[in-house]
Each structure stands twice: as C-alpha cells, then as structure tokens.
Amino acid sequence: MAITEIQTATAGSVANLVPVVKAHIASSRFPNGGLIGVHATPTKTEYFQVVAVGGTTATDYDIVVSQDRADFTIKCNAKITAGFVPLGDMSVIQLTPGRMVEYAQAFTKA
C-alpha cells in the first residue's frame, strides 16, 4: 500500500515513545524508517519515530536501548527470537564527550 501521509511521534524517553507509537498503530499509522535519538541537553535525550498511513503494517512496536554494546546485541537478538523485526538503522546517541553512547533500535512485529 502506498504511503499517503506521515507524522512524527516524539517523546523524551523510550518508555514514553513506545506507547505513543503503539497508539498510532491502533489508528492505522505504522512506524516507517529508523528510530532517531538526539542528545537534546546535557541530561535529556529526545526520541523520534516517523509513522505513516499506508506502507508496511505492524501489530506491535518496541525499542531496545543500552549503553553497553554487548548487552545491546543480546537484547536485540532476544527481540528477534521473540518474532520482532528490526526497523531501519540503529541510532547511536553520544551522551557525553568521548565514548559514552547509547545504542537504540526500533523493532516491529507484523
């Protein structure tokens, strides 16, 4: 199905974004493209997910986040084992100058 409309879902945490996107899914607006995370202030990260009318449908949505790459890999593989599919590219958010980052990946289920 062709995409006929897009909108951006946004929240100040993964815990808050997931239910926002799930509400969009219930209204037939489905996640499209990768999750974007932006370090907005020294203590705040904002998360963005485009949702679209049309395109690939989904019945569920979740996000895996971790500041540890090995932990992130384990959590992502567990999501895949549970029947979820990665959505778009992962987001790597630099939290502080240097190497402190947060890895984030959105997942959907058909």
Role assignments for model-derived ranges:
Residues M1-A110:
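Terminus-proximal functional modules
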